[in-house]
From Swiss-Prot:
Pfam families: Omega-toxin (PF06357). One of its GO terms (cellular component) is extracellular region. The keyword Transferase does not apply. It comes from Hadronyche versuta (Blue mountains funnel-web spider). It is found in: Secreted. This is Omega/Kappa-hexatoxin-Hv1h. Residues 23-35 form a propeptide. Disulfide bonds join 40-55, 47-60, 54-74.
Length: 76
């Protein structure tokens, strides 16, 4: 086997192994996403509109704090 053929074989092997690893990583990420989605923010705790939902049918509502800043809290 000459150098060019060996290089091509290694390139194909690396591509196959890289694809397998990417697939496994994607599956792990999905499993972690399910775990994270099961978590909810307790009532009367700060929340974000783009992250976990509030627990106990509460909603993430916008309020003003004592400094006049806009904050979000889970309120029932």
């Amino acid at each position: 086997m000459n150098t060019a053929t060996g290089f091509i074989v290694l390139l194909v092997l690396a591509t196959i192994l890289g694809g397998i690893e990417a697939g496994e990583s994607h599956m792990r990420k999905d499993a972690m996403g399910r775990v994270r989605r099961q978590y909810c923010v307790p009532v009367d705790q700060p929340c974000s509109l783009n992250t976990q939902p509030c627990c106990d049918d509460a909603t993430c509502t916008q309020e003003r704090n004592e400094n006049g800043h806009t904050v979000y809290y889970c309120r029932a």
